[in-house]
Amino acid sequence: MKHSSTIRFHVDPIFAEELKYLPWHLPIADWKAPGVRILDIKRGIARHTVVFVRQGRFSFGIKEISEEISKKEIENYEQLLLKGIHTLIPAGYVVREEEPIAVNTPVGMHYEPNNISHTVTLLVEKVLPDSQLYSRNFRKENRHKILDAIVRLFVQLHGNGVYWGDASLANTLIKFEKREVPFVGKRTFLMAYLSDAETVEIRQELSHSMREAELNFFFESMEWINEDLKASGIRRDNVVTEEDKKYILSTYNTLYDVELKKKKFEQQTSFNIDKFLGSISDPSYVDLFLKHIEEHKWYIGERLKRDVTLADATRDWYKTIFVPMCEVFRNEKIVDVFPGKTAAELYIEIMTNKYYLSEQANRDVGMAEAMRDYAKRFGIAEQHDSLLKQITDKMLGILDPMETFFPSRK
């Protein structure tokens, strides 16, 4: 007598209505026959059978795998999302219980469970696997933008104690995304998403050797992609691959250093840089922000004639100095005058330039001179002079009380 398969659903209630009508009693490779709306989406090489479907309000990626791994993978996705890591949104897992497998043992017939599970995730729209992007002949600048996105994902994972375990191009999705940049507005970025969480391990922190092993494994995956491309008739310059590896390693080391400094900064100030200032790609900028805050702490302590905590000084500096200056940059469109610079970068670079010039001149040069020098060295045209004066005057209005208090303090 033929065994009737049993279907068990372990899915988020949001997606339950759509998922229950799919033909789970069949292997997903055969779903086209029952009229399931299969989506034709390019993807990288996969070890398991994967289909993409549109069902009701949602599009799903469905991977056929063992129940134990499927359960763990869904839990991993949930943990990654709680940590703010760019990854897939899990819908849950669905198990088909087939007829048990009979195994003859010395003590008699034993029946092993024969369960086939399916990891179900929400489909990320308008995204390409990096293995597809990797086959294209991009200019170095654009290739670096793709690699930057991947490095940021690595730093995000490792900074949160997450060991990917199967870091590879095939398990990475790349997507153009609009994100809000503080005091600048929406900008488009390339973002990398972790798209396979089977082997993810979440720890308190990762050792240097684990992080190094993860990167080396990823470098091996680049070689595998090269071999796959070669087999399909596409040849990629080995020199370019080696250059890419060096670029990834160098960028990773810099951004991981930034990540460590940001965490220390938050411990000292109770202030999240990413949330309030935006992304920073230079480790020294974190140190400079802290220096400015410590200076502001001294200033308000002198003004109030009492000790001020670093956390209180940070909040006051942000409210009375940083925000007003960045609003000047935004309102006067100075970000357009200095293309590619964020408001936070402009703040640091102009203030740092003032410190540098004052040290060279052995006197306080003032904001106006510092701004003019910064503009001149970064190639601002003559027609921006009136705008520059207007901006400088507004910046001076913000900084005047501090200028009066310690004109030459460094």
Language model segments and positions:
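Low-complexity, highly charged intrinsically disordered N-terminal segments
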Residues: 2-10, 53, 64
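Activation-loop N-terminal segment of eukaryotic-like protein kinases
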Residues: 174-188
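C-lobe/activation-segment region of protein kinase-like
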Residues: 186-266
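Intrinsically disordered, low-complexity, repeat-rich regions
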Residues: 239-251, 269-273, 278-285, 290, ...
